[in-house]
Curated annotation (Swiss-Prot):
Catalyzes the rearrangement of 1-deoxy-D-xylulose 5-phosphate (DXP) to produce the thiazole phosphate moiety of thiamine. Sulfur is provided by the thiocarboxylate moiety of the carrier protein ThiS. In vitro, sulfur can be provided by H(2)S. The keyword Cytoplasm applies. The gene is thiG. This is Thiazole synthase. 1-deoxy-D-xylulose 5-phosphate binds at G157, A183, G184, N205, T206. Its EC number is 2.8.1.10. Its main location: cytoplasm. It comes from Staphylococcus epidermidis (strain ATCC 35984 / DSM 28319 / BCRC 17069 / CCUG 31568 / BM 3577 / RP62A).
């Protein structure tokens, strides 16, 4: 359906794999979402020791585009090291650069993020940075050569939806690389809204894994994303300040 770098994504829903109650629920949610992209925190995969538990042991990663992230990194060097671990383990089709700058809000550090992207691009990675909804930063990263930008809707795990749709629209309208909305999506309505703004895709985790029924929510998110994309392509009617009758005025002469 669209590409990030040389990778073809069949679904506009990218699914995070953490926080699921158990492996069965995780597997069913993945199936219901119809995604072909799975993201995961490298530090949770125990890639450096195959004898330790692996939360994706029940998933055949060969069926998916693997999208590891550098969650847990607070510096550029930490993020680069995490990316290299994933790459050496052979589970790094593309990398989500995530460098947290504040422990309370979990907002990304723009300066460290830029440095990570610069190094990983030089090493040949397909790079997708997680950023705040900062148009100028998105533009600078695109100039650097990133393959997609991933602005947040609102802080990670808050489920607040799109806090600043105007800024998000600025990023989408000015980008020539895919825009994947990441973090803060709480419901299919939020996901649909982001897609109606013109986003290329949505990355979800908590909104699905923490739902009362993650499998149903995975399907609901898939439908919301598809509906939002169709709406964007169809083109909504303009917003007006005066009413306009939907029925024609012809035939009223007899009144």
């Amino acid at each position: 359906m669209f590409k990030i770098g040389n990778l073809e994504l069949q679904s506009r829903l990218l699914l995070g794999t953490g926080k699921f109650e158990n492996e069965e629920v995780q597997s069913k949610a993945i199936e219901a979402s119809e995604t072909n992209v799975l993201t995961f925190a490298v530090r949770r995969m125990n890639l450096y020791d195959r004898n330790l538990p692996n939360p994706l042991a029940n998933v055949n990663l060969k069926d998916f585009i693997t999208f590891p992230n550098t969650a847990g990194a607070k510096t550029a060097q930490e993020a680069i090291r995490i990316a290299e671990i994933a790459n050496h383990a052979g589970v790094c089709d593309m990398i989500k650069v995530e460098v947290i700058g504040d422990d309370e809000t979990l907002l990304p550090d723009p300066f460290e993020t830029y440095e990570v992207c610069k190094v990983l691009l030089e090493k040949g990675y397909t790079v997708c940075p997680y950023i705040s909804n900062d148009l100028v930063l998105a533009q600078r990263l695109e100039e650097l050569g990133v393959h997609a930008v991933m602005p947040l809707a609102s802080p990670i795990g808050t489920g607040r939806g799109i806090n600043n749709p105007l800024n998000l629209s600025y990023i989408i309208e000015n980008a020539s690389v895919p825009v994947i909305v990441d973090a803060g999506i709480g419901s299919p309505k939020d996901a649909c809204h982001a897609m109606e703004l013109g986003a290329d895709g949505i990355l979800l985790n908590t909104a699905i894994s923490a739902a009362k029924d993650p499998v149903k929510m995975a399907e609901a998110m898939k439908l919301g994303i598809n509906a939002g994309r169709l709406s964007y392509e169809a083109g909504r009617i303009p917003v007006k300040y005066t009413a306009q009758a939907s029925s024609p005025s012809e035939g009223l002469g007899f009144l």
